[in-house]
Amino acid sequence: LTKKFNIPLIFDEITVGWRVANGGFHKKIKINPDIAVFSKATSNGFPLGTIIGKKNIMKTAQNSFISSAYWTENIGFVAAISMIKFFIKNNVSKKLIHKGRSIKKIWKTVSKKYEVKIKISGLDPLPVFNFNYHEKNDEMMTYFTQEMLKLGFLAHGSCFIMLSHSNKLIKKYEKAFEVVFKKIFYILNNKKGKFKPLLKGRVKFAKFKNPV
């Protein structure tokens, strides 16, 4: 469609970044967009924004100048070079995908064992699960976070996989996840699914929603 109507194809790689493939998600699916945008994941958290693109598109920016608070700062560039070298040398994206699949498998296995209805989605290194109980979903996710916190995990339905997430840590997460889902199973079947009275704080709410 973009070619048909002569519209530049832009990939927002700010969230996906390098998690799926070296160089970005567009490398994984073998599409060369007109523009791809990356953020500080490229520099492992240091201030940096990256815009890459085809020559005929990028050359239009040569006559413009946009000031920035960090435009003279070199730390971000040095960090990015180091990160890219480390990422490629250690095949980080492959490891993130493997760890993410392990998390998805835990969710699927435990939820099936305790008959708790969830929906699993997201890319492997960015896995997401949501409860499937309609109006109870927010209460259940709040309870899940509350109980996981007691076991040492600041957890939610989304999981941003990191290289530092060791197999030992994932196993520990699995045990905690099962403990909490066993409680959820009990509440659903013996407490009429009433989670709100068990919460120590208010039910989670979405103050900001990404329109993308």
Give a label for each model feature.
Residues 1-212:
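Conserved N-terminal phosphate-binding loop of PLP-dependent enzymes in the Aspartate aminotransferase
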